[in-house]
From Swiss-Prot:
Pfam families on file: LGT (PF01790)
Residues the record lists as binding a 1,2-diacyl-sn-glycero-3-phospho-(1'-sn-glycerol): 154
CC terms in the record's Gene Ontology section: plasma membrane
Biological pathway: Protein modification; lipoprotein biosynthesis (diacylglyceryl transfer)
Keywords: Cell inner membrane, Cell membrane, Membrane, Transferase, Transmembrane, Transmembrane helix
Record GO terms (molecular function): phosphatidylglycerol-prolipoprotein diacylglyceryl transferase activity
Disulfide bonds: none
Xref: InterPro entries: Lgt
Domain of life: Bacteria
Official protein name in the record: Phosphatidylglycerol--prolipoprotein diacylglyceryl transferase
HAMAP family: Lgt
């Protein structure tokens, strides 16, 4: 058993080098998430009379805005690591060393899902206003893909040797090389694989959302527009509060890692607010007796 456990370690962030181009696992995982998300969202959108072209037009906007939001959110709380002498970095491209601001090096990690959710939601709101689409219906068909994409994307943390938890001797412990350990834990070798916990949690959320969606289109459960999105907010945030408590690299509001002593873990605070928002949203949706979405394509198939 110990021999099997010892192999649970990252093979490295880089998948392959093609000349001067380095293909990283994180990029591959994001690409896979996007492709699966596009296919799934288009499929679910057909049940709510959302034209596939709408999802296709939205996806690149959503991807870019989410990546920007995720990076901006992270850098905002970690600005000291990118300011001063660390402001500039160099990338190798076509045999050249090109100077760029270090906060643009997203391939080295340093993104926050809450930033992606905030900026992604803003982009969906603006898109739906311009395209005259029903915001809640569009959001409902996207959140299952978001949950699945998070489950896949979290493995990027594994390959980058980041976002791990406290030291542990559990059978599922994760080996972290010395160069990736925080100084205060340099004498420890095995840590909680918090990326794995969140990945599994997100898979469960994805399955729950798909199950509820299917019950809804079959008329077995009343799920007004927006309810699925609120359920996602609540379920994801509940898991994130617990998982974030295990991590030793949190973004802190006051205090400092690994325990944010004298301060708060920002992800836990945001998650708590999202639970409140999602709970209020569900109450409002059912209290106001919002209309059920129109499942035109399903009914057409039954004829």
């Amino acid at each position: 058993m110990e021999g099997i456990i010892a192999t649970f370690r990252s093979p490295g962030a880089e998948l392959i080098e093609l000349g001067t181009l380095t293909v990283r696992w994180y990029g591959i995982l994001i690409a896979i998430s996007v492709l699966i998300g596009l296919k799934l969202s288009t499929r679910l959108g057909s049940y709510r009379n959302i034209n596939p072209g709408i999802i296709n037009d939205l996806m690149p906007i959503l991807i870019l805005s989410s990546i920007f939001g995720a990076r901006f959110y992270y850098v905002s709380f970690e600005w000291n690591n990118y300011n001063g002498v660390n402001f500039w970095s160099k990338v190798h491209l076509l045999g050249l060393q090109i100077p760029i601001p270090s906060f643009l090096e997203i391939w080295n990690g340093g993104i926050a899902i809450h930033g992606a959710l905030i900026m992604g939601t803003i982009s969906i709101i603006l898109f739906c206003r311009i395209k005259k689409q029903r915001f809640w219906d569009v959001l409902d068909v996207l959140v299952p893909s978001v949950a699945l994409g998070q489950a896949i994307g979290r493995w990027g943390n594994f390959f980058n040797n980041e976002a791990f938890g406290l030291p542990t001797n559990q059978p599922w412990k994760l080996f972290i090389p010395f160069s990736s350990r925080p100084e205060s834990f340099s004498d420890q070798s095995y840590f909680h694989p918090t990326f794995l916990y969140e990945s599994l949690w997100n898979i469960c959320i994805f399955l729950i959302l798909i199950f509820l969606f299917r019950l809804n289109i079959r008329g077995l459960m009343k799920l007004p527009s927006g309810a699925l999105s609120c359920i996602y907010l609540i379920t994801y945030s509940l898991g994130r509060i617990w998982i974030e408590g295990l991590r030793i690299d949190p973004l802190c509001l006051g205090g400092s890692p690994p325990f944010c002593e004298g301060g708060l873990r920002i992800a836990q605070l945001i998650s708590f607010l999202l639970i409140c928002l999602g709970s209020f949203g569900l109450w409002w949706i059912y209290q106001s007796k919002r209309k059920m979405p129109n499942f035109g394509i399903t009914r057409n198939r039954k004829k």
